[in-house]
């Protein structure tokens, strides 16, 4: 199988998981180091997607990578939710299968891969934003942003600071200093799916060691009012509390847009706390739950067989790889797993502003999939 085919297989697995999973709710992972919360508001569909991933390479010399990412499907275009699914799953698969050494370059290449995938599918009529922060086990930190989703850093001494720039016409024309820009100035000039000319540049995070939280927010979250948004983040006791409060306020004031928060605690032991049983392990966490992938290659070995295995061919595509190099996806276990402590409490739909402010913990399903690439010798 070619490298491109291998990446497409990982992308389709993540994309299917997101597409068929729940879209609204919240999840915490890594002993409180990662929090994702998403609310539909009064919209018919939640077109926001957010995930946390980390991958351990099969090659020992390559560092492990962790990343938190958010995509907001553009509702005024075709298939906003599907565009967000395709954008974030392509970004994730490109990031974890990329071979370039520098983290910043891998983020840029993964962003361009997502852009081209969405453009090819929707021909410029569908799109999404993208905000992501990533780190490696060697201590590298980098971020990237396209569109008007935002990336903030929270440092106790300095409060909340936006480190991304909204890709709007208003910002491009900021030198005009218009007192109250008309709505057309707030339109996006860059988005995932626009095709050629994206030219996304990574954001350097040289002082990452001073950061407490990296905060990713869709526009439905931060537009509740800048002072209110900043006040909630700055005065919340925990990151999850902050995320849920922002989404609740968004719903209380009308819920005119989806609201999604994804927060990464920089102090979390993202790599030492995760000890996968197999090399090549990829973990993806999102509102649907937790997806575990084991990705590795085998040469001249027969297909794995198991009476309980759910084995199927890779999805057919027009540009499918040549025959003779089969790929097996084996569903090796389905079990309930969660970092939340209460495994009996039901999930609460946080899009309902009249519900109790106490957000009950709940358990999400974990799907373990082993992807084995079998090559002829």
Language-model features: where?
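PP2C/PPM-type serine/threonine phosphatase catalytic domain
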Residues: 1-377
């Amino acid at each position: 199988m070619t490298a491109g085919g291998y990446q497409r297989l990982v992308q389709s697995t993540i994309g299917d998981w997101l597409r068929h999973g729940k879209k609204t709710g919240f999840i915490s992972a890594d002993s409180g180091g990662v929090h994702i919360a998403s609310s539909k508001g009064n919209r018919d569909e939640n077109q926001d997607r957010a995930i946390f991933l980390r991958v351990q390479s099969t090659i020992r010399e390559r560092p492990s990578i962790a990343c938190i990412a958010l995509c907001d499907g553009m509702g005024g275009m075709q298939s906003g939710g599907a565009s967000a699914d395709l954008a974030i799953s392509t970004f994730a698969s490109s990031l974890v299968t990329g071979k370039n050494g520098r983290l910043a370059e891998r983020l840029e290449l993964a962003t361009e891969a997502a852009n081209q995938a969405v453009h090819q599918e929707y021909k410029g009529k569908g799109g999404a934003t993208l905000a992501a922060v990533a780190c490696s086990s060697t201590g590298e930190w980098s971020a990237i942003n396209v569109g008007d989703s935002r990336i903030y850093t929270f440092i106790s001494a300095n409060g909340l600071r936006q480190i991304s720039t909204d890709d709007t016409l208003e910002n491009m024309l900021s030198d005009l200093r218009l007192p109250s820009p008309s709505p057309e100035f707030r339109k996006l000039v860059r988005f995932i799916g626009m095709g050629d000319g994206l030219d996304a540049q990574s954001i350097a995070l040289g002082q990452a060691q001073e950061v407490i939280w990296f905060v990713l927010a869709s526009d439905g979250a931060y537009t509740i009012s800048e002072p209110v948004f900043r006040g909630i983040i700055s005065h919340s006791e925990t990151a999850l509390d902050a995320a849920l409060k922002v989404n609740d306020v968004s719903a209380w004031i009308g819920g005119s847009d989806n609201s999604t928060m994804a927060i990464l605690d920089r102090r979390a032991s993202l790599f030492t706390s995760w000890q996968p049983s197999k090399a090549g392990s990829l973990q993806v966490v999102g509102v649907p739950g937790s997806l575990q992938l084991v990705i590795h290659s085998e040469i001249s070995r027969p297909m794995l067989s198991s009476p309980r295995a759910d084995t199927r061919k890779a999805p057919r595509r027009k540009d499918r790889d040549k025959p003779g190099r089969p790929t097996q996806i084996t569903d090796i276990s389905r079990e309930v797993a969660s970092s939340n402590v209460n495994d009996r409490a039901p999930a609460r739909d946080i899009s309902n502003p009249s519900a109790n402010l106490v957000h009950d913990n709940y358990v999400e399903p974990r799907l373990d999939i082993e992807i084995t690439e079998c090559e002829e010798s």
